[in-house]
UniProtKB/Swiss-Prot annotation:
Record PANTHER family: ELONGATION FACTOR P, ELONGATION FACTOR P (EF-P) FAMILY PROTEIN
UniProt keyword annotation of Protein biosynthesis present: yes
Main localization, broad class: cytoplasm
Record-level Gene Ontology MF annotations: translation elongation factor activity
Protein's name according to its UniProt entry: Elongation factor P
One GO location term (cellular component): cytoplasm
Function according to Swiss-Prot or TrEMBL: Involved in peptide bond synthesis. Stimulates efficient translation and peptide-bond synthesis on native or reconstituted 70S ribosomes in vitro. Probably functions indirectly by altering the affinity of the ribosome for aminoacyl-tRNA, thus increasing their reactivity as acceptors for peptidyl transferase.
């Protein structure tokens, strides 16, 4: 157990019996009240975001983690099958561990898997950006190209992304896996 004041952003703690990742931690001292830490956390089992106010002296249980590189192989029902690139062992990863970024996973992509000290999977981190081919989008007319609007496009993984009007079917685009937003077009 350590004091909340010694915990930083990105740490994984056990809070109310479940693992949580600290997304942000801000120290506040309002007027003549006692200091506290305002924490924004992500429950790693359910994927839900939680806000909590810790007292400045509160103790939390920090989980010791191990990070390993894995390669995505294929989907098996609700699970994603990943392979350890060193030992070639395969593991099944539940979709909830990957979160909303699962819609951008394509074959052979490398991911970081964070394991707890008991061997359970806490989270799966995809690369920040992925390059995917647009498989379906409405063709842009001459009038559309002059304006700065967006249109929906389906990429090779089946995800829908809003793209600029000049993007056509067959274009390769870069997508931010954290937000699901179009970043730019990849030149070949």
């Amino acid at each position: 157990m350590v004091s909340i004041s010694n915990v930083s952003k990105g740490a994984i703690i056990r809070w109310k019996g479940e693992p949580h990742s600290i997304e942000s931690l801000v120290h506040r001292t309002p007027g003549n009240l006692r200091a506290f830490y305002q924490a924004s956390m992500k429950n790693l089992k359910t994927g839900r975001n939680v806000e909590y106010r810790f007292s400045a002296t509160e103790q939390v249980d920090v989980i010791v983690t191990e990070r390993k590189k894995y390669q995505y192989l294929y989907r098996d029902g609700e699970d994603y099958v990943m392979m350890d690139t060193e030992t070639f062992d395969q593991i099944n990863v539940p979709e909830v561990a990957i979160g909303s970024a699962s819609r951008f996973i394509k074959d052979a992509v490398m991911v970081d898997i964070v394991f707890a000290d008991d061997g359970s999977i806490l989270e799966v981190e995809l690369p920040t950006f992925v390059e995917l081919e647009v498989t379906e989008t409405n063709p842009a007319s001459k009038d559309d190209r002059a304006t700065s609007g967006t249109k929906p496009a389906i990429v090779e993984t089946g995800a829908e992304v809003n793209v600029p009007m000049f993007i056509q079917t067959g274009s390769i685009i870069r997508i931010d896996t954290r937000s699901g937003e179009y970043m730019d077009r990849v030149k070949k």
